């Protein structure tokens, strides 16, 4: 280095990394949350997703966290849950139903209604 300059790009500062007020980030996060929630509803159900969201909001309020970071925390938790869920071998493709028949560890809940009443 004859010029004395460091040819490497300098690391961005903390504020540059977490500047969550930029428009593209907001749009990306909203789109990803919409897609992730649509898929997560098929596997976990609304009750669990609402509990996770409430947890993230409570933590965010406790620490005065901006809404974008709260949404991103929710996104990370649900995305990791989906990864583990699929990694454990989920084969579900239909909508989540907490009351479907459970046989040999598959499905969950009460038996299906009798034929003709379904």
UniProtKB/Swiss-Prot annotation:
Entries under InterPro entries matching the protein = Lentiviral_Vpx_assoc_factor, RetroV_VpR/X
Q: Where in the cell is it found?
A: Virion; Host nucleus
Cellular compartments per GO CC: host cell nucleus; virion component
Q: Which GO terms describe its biological process?
A: symbiont-mediated suppression of host innate immune response; viral life cycle
* Stretches for region Disordered: 98-118
Q: Which UniProt keywords apply?
A: Host nucleus, Host-virus interaction, Inhibition of host innate immune response by virus, Viral immunoevasion, Virion
Q: Which Pfam families match?
A: VPR
Q: Which Gene3D superfamilies match?
A: 1.20.5.4730
Q: What is its biological role? A: Plays a role in nuclear translocation of the viral pre-integration complex (PIC), thus is required for the virus to infect non-dividing cells. Targets specific host proteins for degradation by the 26S proteasome. Acts by associating with the cellular CUL4A-DDB1 E3 ligase complex through direct interaction with host VPRPB/DCAF-1. This change in the E3 ligase substrate specificity results in the degradation of host SAMHD1. In turn, SAMHD1 depletion allows viral replication in host myeloid cells by preventing SAMHD1-mediated hydrolysis of intracellular dNTPs necessary for reverse transcription.
Q: Spell out the note in the miscellaneous section.
A: This is an African green monkey isolate.
Q: Which family does it belong to?
A: Belongs to the lentivirus VPX protein family.
What name has this protein been given in UniProt?
Protein Vpx
Q: Could you tell me which species this protein originates from?
A: Simian immunodeficiency virus agm.grivet (isolate AGM gr-1)
Q: What is the lineage of its organism?
A: Viruses, Riboviria, Pararnavirae, Artverviricota, Revtraviricetes
């Amino acid at each position: 280095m004859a010029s004395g300059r460091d040819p490497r790009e300098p690391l961005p500062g903390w504020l540059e990394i977490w500047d969550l007020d930029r428009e593209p980030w907001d749009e990306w996060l909203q789109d990803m949350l919409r897609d992730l929630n649509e898929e997560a509803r098929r596997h976990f159900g609304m009750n669990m997703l609402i509990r996770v969201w409430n947890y993230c909001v409570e933590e965010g309020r406790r620490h005065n966290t901006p809404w974008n970071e709260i949404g991103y925390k929710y996104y990370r938790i649900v995305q990791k849950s989906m990864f583990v869920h699929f990694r454990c071998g989920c084969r579900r493709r239909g909508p989540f139903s907490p009351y479907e028949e459970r046989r040999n560890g598959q499905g969950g809940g009460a038996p299906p209604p009798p034929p003709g009443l379904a």
